[in-house]
Amino acid sequence: MNTLTKLGLMISLLCGTSLTQASDIAARTADMAGAELRPSDSVQIRNKQFGDLLRPEDANRADGTPIVLYPAQPWKCMTWKLLSAGDATFCLQNHFTSKTIAPAPASEGTNPPVKQTALPQNAAEQPAWIFTKLPDGSYKIAAAKSGETLTAVPGARGGSPQIVIAPWQNREAQKWEVRKIDPRTLTM
């Protein structure tokens, strides 16, 4: 029994469930944690350096909203549905805004910010991200068009860390933990 399964079992027992129910919950938690990513999965994406989750700034629904990191909450704005765009390649659809993310045009700087944008109806036009599992279990998430990687950088004036795309340098700021989550458990 791995640590995650034990933790799920302990939490379930503390919440007053029966041993059978607790075992079932622990098994489902372990299954979700160890499974490969698939289209239609709902996930939260945590940056390894900062420990926070990917979301649109201030949970704003507007196109052009910067993508930032925020402390973990069971909120729809921090949860993404994986839409198939090829082998280990996905378009991310936010559960709260129903929009996706894409790098801003290169004219916005050397490491363009990642911003929220409307989800194109034509799948071929949807921004795609390649998820590459690393030896430590985290993921490198790269823009399919440029190959540049989602990277967290400190926010201006002490604000939330901002998300940009940058060449891969194997830094913690470029590594992401992807955890499946049941969207029925989300609030807001």
Feature names for model-found ranges:
Residues 1-8:
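Bacterial N-terminal signal peptides that target proteins for export
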Residues 8-16:
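Bacterial N-terminal signal peptides
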Residues 18-21:
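Sec/Tat signal peptide C-region and signal peptidase I cleavage site
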Residues 23-188:
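Lectin-like carbohydrate-binding module/patch detector with strong preference for beta-trefoil
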